[in-house]
Structures are given as structure tokens and as C-alpha cells.
Amino acid sequence: MDFSDLKKPGKVFFTITDEPEIKNGFQLKDGLNIIDSDKEVPQEFDCDYKPIVPNXLYFSEPKYICEYMAYGIYLREVYLPDDPKLKITRMKNFPCGKSMMYGANMIILGKKHKLSDPETYEYIEKCGGKLRYDGDNALLMAAENGYYEVVTYLINKGCDPRSDYDYALRSAAEKGHIDVVKLLLEKGADISSHNHWPLSYAALEGKFEMVKFLISRGADVRAKNYNPIKYALDGGHREIADYMLDLCPEIGSVSDDDTYDSDSSDYSEDDSESIN
């Protein structure tokens, strides 16, 4: 496999890192990073059939980087060293068939950009990145982390607040980011999506103020046979359950043992209407 195009001097790649910046047990550092440089690295590795190669440092071309936003809080510039010992492998089908990631035994780690900063996304685009590549992962990540300014920027750039069955709204509600939830609703997100799952997951995670806010905006406590109440009980949040029970006098009392397995399979793509 010919990787000559990847090895062009000054060509920039990206990787996503967390805090601390450890990948596969390897502590990343600014500048040159070398890992297991004497081990054989296959030129192509199909992630559908094998586990991730443990002895590689991973990076992506700018076009695909938004596919990997959930993996951390920083965008790091990556460059490849001009070294005859450099070995590269193409990571096929990670995390899906449309994605393109590479691994190498050595990389040069460049500037760190915060994913909470809208300017980071401007830079991604400047480098050829697609903010909506294969969906709206960048928006979903920003909403989940409460990055209000980034959510605003991405929506203004064309990202869809209703993408993936309003998953951004559900994630922001689940994490208690009321300002982001308000923004998403203003931009067209549907509070009733998937049988009001923003309310159910806010209840599951014990976000009382979020629960009150969503109900004030029309979220249905009775959705799908009182799922939000069941989710509150499942999460051990009796106070939230009692608050919602007071809004449903027809139920009467419910014991703490009346819990619910909150697996997301409870929702299907066809499950979009409330069941009262």
C-alpha cells in the first residue's frame, strides 16, 4: 500500500485526546512520540474482524476527524516524521465503513486545541475537515459536554439539531445543560422525540431542575406508560419520581421496587408517539 501522499512534508493530521493524554497505555507528549518501533505494523487492519492494533498511535485526516469527537476534549495536530523507520497502517472500518483512521509507530504531536472553543472547528474546516461528515457527531459531542458556544456555532454552520432522533437534546438533558437544551429547542429540536426521552434520561440521571424545565416546556410525564417516572425510580431518584407522580393523580402511590430497566432498546425508530 502506497502511503507516499501521507508522508508529504508539513501535511497535517488530527487526533482526539482526553485528560490525561494516554493512548493504549502510552503517555503522549509534545513533539516526537515513538511506540514499539521494532514491532511489525500491518499496512491495513480491518477492525470489523480483529481488535485494535495495540502498538500504534492513531490519527485521522482532517476530513474524517469529526467522526471521533467523542474520544476526548482536545484536538491535537499530528505530523509524520521523515524517518525510514516510520510504519503506517490503515485502520479499516473504524468505527464504521465510511471512516478513515491511520496508526503509526511514531508521530509528531503538535498544537493542542480545545474542543470547547468554536475557533477549533473553524480551524478544522480550514484544514479540510467536514463538520457534518457522516452525521452530526461534532454537534452531539458538544451538546453532551455543554459547549454552548460550540453548539451555537455548529448549528449556524448547518448542523441539524434534530439529527439522530434529537440525540443532542437527549444528551444535553441527561447531563443537565439547561442552556444548551434551551438553545436546541429554540433551533427546532423536538422535546417529544422518542417518547420524550430527554425527560426520561434527565430523570434517570437525577437532574431535577432539568426535569422541571422540560415539563414546563411540554414534556409528557405520562409518555409511554409513565416511562419518565419509571426512569426516575430506576435511577434511585425518589424525589423526582414523587414530583412527577404529583402531576399524575390517576396513578396513586408507587413503591421504590417498581423500577425499570433503562436500556436504550426500549426505544425504536418507529417509537415516536407518546402512549398515554
From Swiss-Prot:
Protein keywords: ANK repeat, Repeat
Keyword Repeat on entry: yes
Pfam families for this protein: Ank_2
Presence of the UniProt keyword Repeat in the record: yes
PROSITE patterns per record: ANK_REP_REGION, ANK_REPEAT
InterPro entries linked to this entry: Ankyrin_rpt, Ankyrin_rpt-contain_sf
Domain of life the protein comes from: Viruses
Protein name: Putative ankyrin repeat protein R838
Species of origin: Acanthamoeba polyphaga mimivirus
